[in-house]
């Protein structure tokens, strides 16, 4: 026992030194060990990015930082993301007259034809919402969809009433099930040819030149194509095009005679689910909810 006592005494003396060596760091009254992997700033809003960076520079092992009380503009997000590529940040994004947490799975601007519009640059901040599965940015001035490359898990996408000409980024969204593209300036549908999970597609009022890319989408349940090759109500889609699509897609309900939102487009159980999910910021799977809605 006498031999153990000096050893225990030595361990007691070394313990404070070990703790001191490990160390802690404090920011906005939040104290964490320097070897932590997760930081939650809670209700503390960051006002000084330089001070935040000085804090994070002392945490070499951190991989997740939640700071949802801080409203972040695009330039601030870019600055932190570039400096700390190893860290996943939880932010509240601020763009236009909207705010959105980066952990949201659904988002809609809830715009109509009288709402103030936002540009592609405004929406590019959404690339930080990696978990988004449903997105509605209809009734805006979107002409560049590049930011969609960072949202590979989208299942519902509404881009109606914008200025889109190039839909190439849509080819990177293999999980898409519902897609509204009406009232844009789209000519080439090729990027849609690989979307084998797509159930609902609305391309009314565009400038489509070739419909062949749609002929392989045999899983489609609904396809709205009224005036999809022009904007003139007096020049209907050629009957030959309609016949070709009906032959290629015998199990698809194809509507070539009704306006983009008429003919039952918004009277389907899946639209009811979409309306419900965009009332909040949480994605609702169609299969799970349709039975309830019906």
Where are these regions (language model features)?
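Concave beta-strand-loop units of leucine-rich repeat
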Residues: 21-143, 147-165, 169-187, 191, ...
């Amino acid at each position: 026992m006498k031999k153990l006592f000096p050893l225990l005494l030595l361990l007691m003396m070394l313990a404070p030194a070990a703790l001191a060596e490990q160390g802690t760091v404090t920011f906005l009254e939040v104290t964490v060990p320097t070897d932590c992997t997760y930081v939650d700033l809670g209700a503390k809003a960051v006002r000084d990015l330089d001070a935040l960076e000085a804090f994070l520079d002392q945490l070499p092992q951190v991989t997740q930082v939640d700071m949802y009380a801080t409203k972040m503009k695009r330039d601030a997000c870019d600055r932190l993301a570039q400096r700390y590529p190893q860290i996943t940040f939880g932010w509240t994004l601020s763009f236009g007259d909207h705010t959105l947490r980066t952990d949201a799975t659904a988002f809609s601007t809830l715009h109509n034809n009288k709402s103030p519009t936002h540009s592609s640059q405004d929406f590019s901040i959404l690339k930080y919402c990696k978990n988004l599965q449903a997105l509605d940015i209809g009734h805006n001035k979107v002409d560049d969809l590049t930011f969609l490359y960072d949202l590979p898990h989208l299942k519902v996408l509404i881009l109606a009433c914008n200025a889109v000409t190039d839909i190439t980024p849509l080819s990177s969204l293999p999980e898409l099930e519902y897609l509204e593209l009406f009232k844009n300036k789209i000519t080439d549908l090729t990027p849609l040819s690989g979307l084998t999970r797509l159930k609902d597609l609305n391309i009314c009022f565009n400038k489509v030149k070739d419909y062949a890319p749609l002929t392989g989408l045999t899983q489609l349940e609904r396809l709205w194509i009224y005036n999809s090759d022009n904007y003139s109500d007096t020049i209907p889609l050629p009957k030959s095009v309609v016949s070709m699509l009906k032959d290629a897609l015998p199990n698809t309900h194809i509507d070539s005679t009704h306006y983009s939102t008429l003919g039952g487009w918004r009277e389907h159980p899946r639209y009811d689910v979409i309306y419900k999910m965009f009332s909040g910021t949480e994605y609702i799977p169609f299969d799970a909810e349709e039975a309830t809605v019906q």
